[in-house]
Regions:
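Intrinsically disordered, low-complexity proline/glycine-rich segments
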Residues: 1-163
């Protein structure tokens, strides 16, 4: 991924509510809203209202659909991310201090994302290689990283409560 031509986005949580904005400068690219005690969520990207559903108990899948039409736009199954009609990629850790990202069939990452979680807010950044639509992939990356941060916080709380 070329740093000069890639699109750099910010993941912002403007309030304590579980709502995030993905911005490129002042332009709003996508929005994400996640419930605290349930999986799934809602969002908007590229002018479409989206719904994120989680399916399965042992092998969890996350499915992104158009809220109005029910059309499936993307599916995350394990580490495999399938963007319908666009491409498939693998969601993986890119190494220490590099965050996580979507890696194409050639082994090159075309999306890189990192989040920081504080006591009340989670923020971060997403970088997408030139030539890729930033809206839906950045929303999926933000969703996966925020859920991962939630799971880590819950595990830490359980460890503290057990001692």
């Amino acid at each position: 991924m070329d740093d000069e031509t890639s699109v750099k986005l910010l993941l912002l949580q403007p309030t304590r509510r579980r709502e995030w904005e993905i911005r490129e400068g002042e332009e709003l690219v996508a929005e994400l809203s996640l419930p605290a005690m349930r999986s799934g969520g809602r969002g908007s990207a590229a002018g479409r209202e989206l719904e994120i559903r989680t399916q399965g108990m042992l092998r969890r899948e996350h499915v992104v659909t158009d809220a109005a039409t029910g059309e499936e736009l993307a599916r995350v199954r394990g580490h495999a991310v399938e963007l319908r009609g666009i491409e498939s990629a693998e969601w993986k850790s890119l190494g220490r201090d590099q965050g996580s990202g979507l890696v194409g069939p050639g082994g090159e990452p075309w999306l890189r994302a990192k989040v920081k979680s504080g006591a009340f807010r989670t923020t971060g950044q997403v970088e997408i290689a030139a030539g890729h639509d930033p809206a839906l992939p950045s929303l999926i990356a933000a969703y996966l990283l925020i859920r991962k941060a939630d799971e880590a916080a819950a595990a830490a709380s359980a460890t503290v409560a057990a001692t």
